[in-house]
Amino acid sequence: MTNIRKSHPLMKIINHSFIDLPTPSNISSWWNFGSLLGICLIPQIVTGLFLAMHYTADTTTAFSSVAHICRDVNYGWLIRYTHANGASMFFICLYVHVGRGIYYGSYMFTETWNMGIILLFSVMATAFMGYVLPWGQMSFWGATVITNLLSAIPYIGTSLVEWIWGGFSVDKATLTRFFAFHFILPFIITALTVVHLLFLHETGSNNPSGIDSDSDKIPFHPYYSIKDFMGFLFVFVILLALVLFSPDLLGDPDNYTPANPLNTPPHIKPECYFLFAYAILRSIPNKLGGVLALVLSIVILIIMPLLHTSKQRSMMFRPMSQCLFWILVANLLTLTWIGSQPVEYPYILIGQLSSMLYFTIILILMPLVSMMENKMLKW
């Protein structure tokens, strides 16, 4: 008799995706982050659902409803901080996942890569709208500043901003629609994740060496399911420590002050995981130029396959490219730090240099160094 997991219509799909999936035998722990993201999404949706049961999307009561969740709801503080810090962990995993894709040349699977970029944009939009919901000072001013960037679009900019706001400023209509979108987007993200996996399983996983691994595959379960579980346990312990010992470490103290349109905070900044993009935006004095740089800092990922000039797929055997990659990582960490600093000397200058270096590495240095490595290997 055939095993039920191989014959049942639904179980068969799960079996081919997570149990009997042929997987390269040499993939490292950097490949854990894809499954980690899927696992991170589940508690985000569950905690979000419980928060939505008690939250009210109204400017007069939003702030106090969040305070009510933390004070009066059974384990409300735990649900709220797990949701907030879970988002930070989600983004750390997301950036590592993208970084691994760049390092090992996974972007050569163009459909999977492009689907991943759509997912990245969706997650960023969801996180931004979620940050607005507690209706603290930073929520309100963050929403005002970031949505206002669209006014830089020629001709239609102002109308577009007012259309998004649902009025002439960030107000009740904005909060209501942001809550609606923040609620629905995670389910859209889940659907997009399935499509992302579908494209991945068409080609099979990449591996650290970057060469074809069809001749050397092993089943996903139990080998990689246990390996992924270890990764999940590791992240879960960090998240738990963050939630229970220092829940406000990654938050902003200004968000404990109710939103006040008449009082601007001294330093408006987004969540910690958007600071690198915010630093790139601020480094250009022109508004439209800044917005373009901000969008391009993420959109640049789409052209990664076109910038690949190396004869080897992975950076595993390319030390010069490896050096460039880690300079890029250090540069992004510098940008993250700059984004959290006030707009004054020397931070402005460091931000401008780091932004320039970011685009230079990806657009010019990486393709050039890859070509040099080809020459050195007489390819």
Curated annotation (Swiss-Prot):
Annotated positions binding heme b b566: 97, 196
One GO-annotated biological process of the protein: mitochondrial electron transport, ubiquinol to cytochrome c
Keywords: Electron transport, Heme, Iron, Membrane, Metal-binding, Mitochondrion, Mitochondrion inner membrane, Respiratory chain, Transmembrane, Transmembrane helix, Transport, Ubiquinone
Cofactor: heme b
Chief location: mitochondrion
Superkingdom field: Eukaryota
Cofactor binding remark: Binds 2 heme b groups non-covalently.
Amino-acid positions noted as binding heme b b562 in the UniProt annotation, renumbered to this chain: 83, 182
Family: Belongs to the cytochrome b family.
Subunit structure: The cytochrome bc1 complex contains 11 subunits: 3 respiratory subunits (MT-CYB, CYC1 and UQCRFS1), 2 core proteins (UQCRC1 and UQCRC2) and 6 low-molecular weight proteins (UQCRH/QCR6, UQCRB/QCR7, UQCRQ/QCR8, UQCR10/QCR9, UQCR11/QCR10 and a cleavage product of UQCRFS1). This cytochrome bc1 complex then forms a dimer.
Name of this protein: Cytochrome b
Organism for this UniProt entry: Fukomys amatus
